[in-house]
Curated annotation (Swiss-Prot):
Residue positions binding pyridoxal 5'-phosphate: 76-77, 102, 156, 175, 198, 240-241
EC number from the UniProt entry: 2.6.1.52
InterPro entries: Aminotrans_V_dom (IPR000192), Aminotrans_V_PyrdxlP_BS (IPR020578), Pser_aminoTfrase (IPR022278), PyrdxlP-dep_Trfase (IPR015424), PyrdxlP-dep_Trfase_major (IPR015421), PyrdxlP-dep_Trfase_small (IPR015422)
Protein name as catalogued: Phosphoserine aminotransferase
GO biological process, one term: L-serine biosynthetic process
Amino acid sequence: MSAIYNFCAGPAMLPAAVMKKAQQELLDWNGLGVSVMEVSHRGKEFIALTKQAEADLRELMHIPQNYHVLFMHGGGRGQFSAVVNNFLGNQGRALYLVSGQWSSAALAEAQKLAGDAQIDSLNIVEKHNCLNAVVLPDLHKIDADYRYVHYCPNETVDGIEIFDELDSPWPIVADLSSTIMSREIDVSRYGLIYAGAQKNIGPSGLSIVIVRDDMLTLPSLPQSSIMDYRLAVEHDSMFNTPPTFAWYLAAEVFAWLKSIGGVASIAKINQQKAQMLYACIDANPFYKNGVVAANRSQMNVTFQLADESLDGAFLKEAEAVGLVALKGHRIVGGMRASLYNAMPLEGVAALVTFMNEFAAKHYNI
């Protein structure tokens, strides 16, 4: 069977080496004669797995010791509510920076749950020559006392990424669901980082939360116990039965990333992949991207065809040659190629070849 390259925005493709290892030991994990899905989450073998997973993630992201690493339920949307309930209290105030669909969704959830607390927001995307561009505000000029400022450095739907470090006088809460471990960041700049697993970590159903000690002293609201960061810390992410298979696969992805040189190594590859695809788009008038170069997402490349009536043919012909899940999000349409860590350079090269051939066949210059 020829190679299939899966450009899905999430759940996304996993590293082939990880999938093969999971396949090989699916029925007999660690010589126990049973699957990892069948062992107790409190057994010594699984506890050892969780400890190694945390150690590997700390090493990969250079996480300081005054941060807790949590493996939680709920995905990114679950964290939208968890952040509010854990940090805002009854009289708190928070600022949300809006750059696209996911930061808008986080804002909407905060507004729904805030009660007597105050939620402020700033739209940080402007049009520059008809292209979307991020303009980060000078937060130090805002006269307010916020518990936290929330932002999403990469908008998967809109194809917008913020590469500049956010400078804030208040704790930063960041949704890194689509960029975690794709490039190096300074974790110490953040009060809390959260990420749904289904893009760069593993299968859906698991969220990673990296939270600084002092954030856990902020007033909280009544909430579900399984989304309480303090309880998660107290119980080593096992207040209730965790998604064990997702945790296992995340551990394998961390080990795989370490084996290929870590985040610094994959960051170079990710940059190459994105540059290759954007070069194709820019060189061919048949394709267009609506984001300024400085804010083009490395993880989620969005583009439109010059003739949208050919969208169906593009997707059908791409799938026929093993390039799948290229349809853009229903909100914005067009195409989207998600280039997460597991996508090899060969997959992007195959997509570029197809795009050039498709344009030559359908576009009259």
